[in-house]
């Protein structure tokens, strides 16, 4: 946005009463917000405000005279309170630079330009927007109705002294409407003032004329070549986003490019029409034939069969590969197809259509595809027990152990039921166990049939017992079903539910399933084993003296003398400074002192040293004693908790060394 250079851009600004009053208010606000220490002259601002009196304007109204009187009173209050401002207050006028050159010319109103804005935000259009501050600036009354709404100043802020005698401080909850607006040069201040005087909402929508001032500036519409770096075609952008490309019917498979997939439309088939699988679906060896054969006899059409016949017919023909077909793929001259012409289809009204077994076997014999069972185990052909003799079995005794039929039918004679059981025994003469079981099944089936027949005959003689017979039949069926449900299964092979005996390895550990323990951590306890001493000691070798010789610069270490020797060119060996002195004799003796007063062991070692006669005596001054005493106190405080303290501690032993030294003197 363009920056506002001055307030007098409008040539009629001096004659406009509202604009003049607005500028006067802004100058008064700036004067009220400044401090003395920043170099701003209050007298200069007062004289400037007096020069801005608009009483000479020919179009002035009576409210303008009131406003001039209010401005004069405000200036008087400012001049009387300027001494109250403390010197350590940050000056508000530091953010503005006042141009004083306009006083010499005809320019009535000076230009106010911001010098710096530390706490302001600058957007991308270089518009200065004031940030929110903790203290609120004094509002400006724009009309006679808003005179009571004056600026509020905190008591703790020295920049805004409280004017207790002013009649403007009656309403304390008033806040200026200018805080709701951002400082924008394109905003029409005259329209905002007009809205405020007419008690209109300043945030209401502007008219078409007023919206022209809020339009985006022309500088934002300038083509700066920002989109030149992007290869974007705006004409084709919508097409690429919203228009979906139509895929061709013949697409290329990414994994197998040589295979072309075709999309075809398949209408919904009627529910009654059923398609049965072809023979090549049942026998995969027939899949090597040409799938695009145009022979109409080999295709199945649902139109040739009616709805009733489609559910009971297989395809009319079967295809089979010839025995002499070549195993080489693609050799169509050698391969041939065989179509049996004598296939018979047995069809009846009550049964499904069945193919001829001979034709099916012929097709199966010509097929190359053979399936082998997985994990086939041959246990025998079933003739292993034929050589063994049959065991003697008492069938009559076993029949007694069998549970007889306990179902009773109401209205039926017991003699028939008993006769049926007798017939069971008369027919039980099997030759083997397997035949005997089959005969028992036949007997039970015949007994059931006789029971049903007797019930039917009884219906003709006894009509009122129809309901009872139905109930008995239902009970018989339920009993049979319950027996089948509660029948226990034969025992199967007992499987080991435990984990298989395979060694488990976790890190460096291995589980031994036989010993049921973990192994592999034996190395952890090897350090605790006693070292095995060698069977014979090592040979003691002679250490040569040449191995210990070391040379550092001009010095050579002699391992025999255990000292360093000068190996300079001169060859002169330096004299030993301690050659005239004898070695010191060790005269130290130790004694152990036991404290008998304390019950615990408090041993102390006191060393008694036999010093030679002291030739010199040093006098210790009082300052040195004070220094040692203070250091001793500090040291005791530091190590006070390091040792155990006893109640009956005898500290007399601490004076032994002192007494010994004094006795020798």
UniProtKB/Swiss-Prot annotation:
Main location group: cytoplasm
Keywords from the named record: Cell cycle, Cell division, Cytoplasm, Mitosis, Phosphoprotein
Any GO CC annotation of this UniProt entry: protein-containing complex
Biased composition (Acidic residues): 96-106
Disulfide bonds: none
Subcellular location: Cytoplasm
Region Disordered, annotated ranges: 96-120, 196-220, 288-336, 404-506
One example of a Gene Ontology biological process annotation: cell division
Post-translational modification Phosphoserine, affected residues: 326
Composition bias type Polar residues, residue spans: 205-220, 288-304, 319-336, 407-432
One function term, GO molecular function aspect: GTPase activator activity
Residue spans crossing the bilayer: none
Domain of life per record: Eukaryota
Matching InterPro entries: Bfa1/Byr4 (IPR034586)
Similarity comment: family membership: To yeast BFA1.
Function, as annotated: Has an essential role in ensuring cytokinesis and septation occur only once during mitosis. It does so by interacting with the ras1 signaling pathways, thereby suppressing them.
Subunit and partners: Interacts with hyperphosphorylated cdc11.
Protein name as catalogued: Protein byr4
Organism, as annotated: Schizosaccharomyces pombe (strain 972 / ATCC 24843) (Fission yeast)
Taxon lineage: Eukaryota, Fungi, Dikarya, Ascomycota, Taphrinomycotina
């Amino acid at each position: 946005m363009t920056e506002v250079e001055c307030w007098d851009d409008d040539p009629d600004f001096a004659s406009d009463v509202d604009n003049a009053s607005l500028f006067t208010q802004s100058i008064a606000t700036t004067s009220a917000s400044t401090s003395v220490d920043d170099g701003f002259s209050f007298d200069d601002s007062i004289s400037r405000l007096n020069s801005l009196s608009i009483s000479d304007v020919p179009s002035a109204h009576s409210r303008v005279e009131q406003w001039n009187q209010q401005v004069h009173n405000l200036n008087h209050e400012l001049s009387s309170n300027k001494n109250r401002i403390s010197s350590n207050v940050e000056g508000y006028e530091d953010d503005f630079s006042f141009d004083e050159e306009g006083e010499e010319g005809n320019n009535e109103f000076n230009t106010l330009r911001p010098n710096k804005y530390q706490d302001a935000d600058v957007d991308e259009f270089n518009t200065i927007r004031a940030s929110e501050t903790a203290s609120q600036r004094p509002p400006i009354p724009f009309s006679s109705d808003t005179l009571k709404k004056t600026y509020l100043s905190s008591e703790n802020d020295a920049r805004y002294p409280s004017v207790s005698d002013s009649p403007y401080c009656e309403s304390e909850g008033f806040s200026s409407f200018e805080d709701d607006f951002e400082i924008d040069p394109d905003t029409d201040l005259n329209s905002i003032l007009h809205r405020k005087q007419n008690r209109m909402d300043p945030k209401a929508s502007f008219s078409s004329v007023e919206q022209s001032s809020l339009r985006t500036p022309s500088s934002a519409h300038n083509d700066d070549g920002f989109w030149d770096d992007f290869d974007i075609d705006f004409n084709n952008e919508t097409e690429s986003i919203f228009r979906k490309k139509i895929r061709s019917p013949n697409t290329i498979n990414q994994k197998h490019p040589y295979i072309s997939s075709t999309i075809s439309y398949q209408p919904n088939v009627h529910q009654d029409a059923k398609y049965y699988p072809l023979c090549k679906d049942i026998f995969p060896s027939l899949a090597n034939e040409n799938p695009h054969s145009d022979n109409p006899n080999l295709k199945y059409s649902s139109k040739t069969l009616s709805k009733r016949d489609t559910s009971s017919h297989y395809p009319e023909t079967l295809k089979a590969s010839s025995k002499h077909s070549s195993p080489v793929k693609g050799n169509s001259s050698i391969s041939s197809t065989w179509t049996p012409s004598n296939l018979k289809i047995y069809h009846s009204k009550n049964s499904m259509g069945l193919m001829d077994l001979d034709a099916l076997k012929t097709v199966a014999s010509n097929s190359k595809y053979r399936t082998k069972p997985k994990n086939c185990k041959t246990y025998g052909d079933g003739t292993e027990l034929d050589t063994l003799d049959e065991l003697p079995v008492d069938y009559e005794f076993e029949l007694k152990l069998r549970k007889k039929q306990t179902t009773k039918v109401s209205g039926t004679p017991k003699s028939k039921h008993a006769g049926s059981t007798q017939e069971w025994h008369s027919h039980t003469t099997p030759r083997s166990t397997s035949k005997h079981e089959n005969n028992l099944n036949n007997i039970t089936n015949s007994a059931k049939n006789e029971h049903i027949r007797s019930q039917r005959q009884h219906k003709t003689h006894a009509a009122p017992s129809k309901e009872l017979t139905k109930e008995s039949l239902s009970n018989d069926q339920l009993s049979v079903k319950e027996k089948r449900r509660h029948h226990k299964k034969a025992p199967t092979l007992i499987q080991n539910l435990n984990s298989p005996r395979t060694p488990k390895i976790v890190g460096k550990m291995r589980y031994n399933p036989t010993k049921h323990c973990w192994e592999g951590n034996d190395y952890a306890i090897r350090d605790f084993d006693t070292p095995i001493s060698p069977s014979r000691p090592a040979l003691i070798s002679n250490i040569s003296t040449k191995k210990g010789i070391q040379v550092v610069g001009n010095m050579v270490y002699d391992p025999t003398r255990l000292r360093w020797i000068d190996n300079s060119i001169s060859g002169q060996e330096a004299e030993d400074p301690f050659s005239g002195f004898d070695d010191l004799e060790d005269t130290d003796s130790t004694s152990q002192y036991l404290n008998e007063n304390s019950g615990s062991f408090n041993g102390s070692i006191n060393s008694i040293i036999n010093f030679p006669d002291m030739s010199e005596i040093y006098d210790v001054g009082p300052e040195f004693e004070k220094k040692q005493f203070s250091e001793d106190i500090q040291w005791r405080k530091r190590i006070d908790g390091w040792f155990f303290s006893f109640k009956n501690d005898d500290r007399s032993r601490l004076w032994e060394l002192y007494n010994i030294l004094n006795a020798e003197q």
